[in-house]
Regions:
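Conserved short beta-strand elements that form part of the metal-binding/catalytic scaffold
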Residues: 27-62, 102-105, 109-116
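Helix N-cap motif at beta-to-alpha junctions
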Residues: 14-16, 69-71
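Short amphipathic alpha-helices within nucleic acid-binding modules
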Residues: 22, 72-77
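Secondary-structure boundary/capping motif
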Residues: 18-20, 63, 99
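Short amphipathic alpha-helical segments
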Residues: 5-7, 60-64
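Vicinal oxygen chelate
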Residues: 1-5, 11, 32, 75-118
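Short hydrophobic/aromatic beta-strand micro-patches
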Residues: 10-12, 65-67
Length: 118
């Protein structure tokens, strides 16, 4: 028997309400009480990294990755909102897609992923 998907992502925040509002504003993640956010079906990568990875800041134990469509348009909106966006052509590959990285207001690392078109 196997699990059928990820049912939630839970993490500590200094100001949970303000951080949830940031995710609602910039990512469309809506939570009302414990009413789940409905997301589009798609691939999910579950992968431990070596403890000395430089894929995200050492002070953080995790990084969340969000699937997005039209990455360039999404990044443009984030930049217009004053969010620092990092891209690197070395992160992108035809077989895996395109990537960008940002941090939320509390410094949590976020990777944005536009999967390859099939």
């Amino acid at each position: 028997m196997a699990v059928s998907g990820i049912g939630g992502v839970f993490f500590r925040a200094k100001d949970p309400d303000a951080l949830l509002e940031w995710y609602r504003t910039h990512f469309g993640v809506t939570m009302e009480g414990y009413e789940p956010w409905q997301q589009a079906a798609g691939p999910t990568v579950f992968m431990p990294f070596a403890s000395n990875t430089d894929h995200w800041p050492e002070a953080k134990q995790w990084m969340i990755n969000f699937r997005v469509e039209a990455l360039d348009e999404f990044l443009s909106k984030l930049r217009q909102a004053g969010i620092d966006v990092k891209t690197d052509p070395a992160w992108d590959a035809p077989e895996t897609g395109r990537f960008a990285r940002i941090q939320d207001p509390e410094g949590n690392p976020i990777e944005l992923w536009e999967p390859p078109v099939e």
